Amino acid sequence: MAECKNIMVYVETAEGNPVKVGLEMLSPAKKLADKVTAVVIGGGVADAAKEVAKAGADQVICVDSEDYKEFNLDAYAQVLVELVKEENPEAVFVGGTQDGKDIAPVVAAKCNTGCASDVLDIKAEDGEVIYTCPLYGGTVLEDVKIKTTPQIATLRSGAFQKVEDPTEGEVVAKEVKVADDVIKAKITESVKEIAETINLEEAEVIVSGGRGMGSKENFALVDDLAKLLGGVVGATRPAIEDGWVSKIHQVGQSGKIVAPKLYIACGISGATQHVSGIMNSGYIVAINKDEDAPIFDVANVGIVGDVMKVLPVMIEEIKKIKDCLLYTSPSPRDRSVS
């Protein structure tokens, strides 16, 4: 039975596409509400809105304007506030992305309501919605009830699954103007840094290295394994502080919260700040010479050993398996057509 009449879900976009957590949030919203209204804001986001409609939203409000081509906290937050006034939702879900974590508290303040952060689970009891949120780096979980409406919540990426067998909703285009005096800061110029770009939050395979890798030269093995598995490289804060990889690779509380299908932790002890960022991974493999390392408490498979001896063997064996699969795969001529 639905606990809410209407839940609004703000679906962020990146390079014209809805981000993963945006689509994931539709699932808990549909379980709780009679109607799920998604909101897409930006410039040239009409196609993204259609994709959201196909992912399970009953209605998608598309605010497509060149005024919102570049993300602006004041403008985007005010657009959401105006739509909240129109739609009167009982709750607003926002993805726990860098921008989402900025928007949610601003919207909550403007609406004079409460905000639950980094939500891992949502349930309904006795007509109330309860948000489960981590504290102290994930070592403690607390249940949060918000007595005011609309309830605002940021949901962690990977904590929820996308809607299964969704029905397609409708897309409604709306023009929402924001007064100039609302915008406190404007982007006058954008300069893109010429550097590597990775998307840890969307990656299905992540191979991460910690200080246990020993040196920048040794860290190259992490990169080799990631490439072999078609994944991306992650790292702990100490490995980044030592200059082995750039900060863009940081996984954990002060980096990116990730939820890959496979996470391989190499030479990582398992500090709370790091573990809290990988808890939603589908399968965790840990390699560490210390059998008492905390990382083994969350790993599905633990390998106790010298990472510099284990990784070369893993890489070699995976290469053999891939070569074998390639060799045994039938050529087009070998395939029969019935």
What are these regions (language model features)?
Residues 327-332:
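Conserved small/polar residues in nucleotide/adenosyl-binding loops
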Residues 1-326:
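N-terminal glycine-rich FAD/FM-binding segment characteristic of electron-transfer flavoproteins
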